[in-house]
Amino acid sequence: MSNSIIKVKKSGFYQDKTKLNLAGSHTWNTVQSIAGKKVSLDALTGNFTRLWTIETKGFVLGNKFYGSNLSGLAKVNVVPWKKDGRLNKQFYSQFEKVVKRAEKRDIVVGVCLFDNAWISYMDRGWEFHPFNGLGPSDPSEVHSKGPWNTFQRAHVKKMVKTLEPYNNVIFEVGNELHRNSVSSFQKNVVKWVKKFTDKPIGVSYASRVKPSAGRTQSWIAKTNADWAAPAGGERIPGFKGHYVFDTDHASALRTNVAGLQAANRRGDSLWLMDGLGGDILKNASNLAPDRAYINSIL
């Protein structure tokens, strides 16, 4: 990889003044193992992947979404915090190893700092979250203003400082954070990242904050984020950064080549949510055409 950090213009991501056509697939367990299973970078498609931070130590999938090969309680091997809110050093060491391997393969990684989906959508997810008992009354409060933000800021600082030596890194505030996050939390995380590093930071769709749910995504324009991945590829009035089309927020686990093609014509970066073999969650349809399309534009 280059010795220069990645920068963002409205037209895309750049490194050494050269535009990077970032397109690739991502899945949940590339950093953390879930039920003892971890996915190798070699199983993914393209020159980019999104690295998830799952916050809970366990959950039950059952028949969620399109099914899973897992049954019973699925345990996550390591998360950012211990039960008392202190940082778990093993998590950051494990994360860094994956980023380093990606760098050797010329893969850019989008580091997703927080997540709401696994504590809000999955059975028993909140039960095993480190903050359960440390302040928030339920998942809807985890990514909102509260004393526990001290633990979250420490996590952001540790992640940014750990990954500062690597120039294949961009950051993302969080995956489908609760709508309570859009008033202050997401803006604050953007501020924290910008204080600690010059690497880009983006925001993405907040859970059920989209036009089809009767809510506007205009909050995105107020975050000072460098890039954004709104639901469905929507254009946000007043947002001046680069757009990403992440199928996780448009057609998650379903084939959508037409959507990828349209986003590519708009100049968006293309990120594909892929359940692969279904060890965690199954794809609803065959994503081979979507993977092939991504490979065809690189």
Language model segments and positions:
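Catalytic-core region of carbohydrate-active enzymes that cleave or remodel glycosidic bonds
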Residues: 200, 218-297
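Active-site mouth of glycoside hydrolases
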Residues: 3-217, 222-225
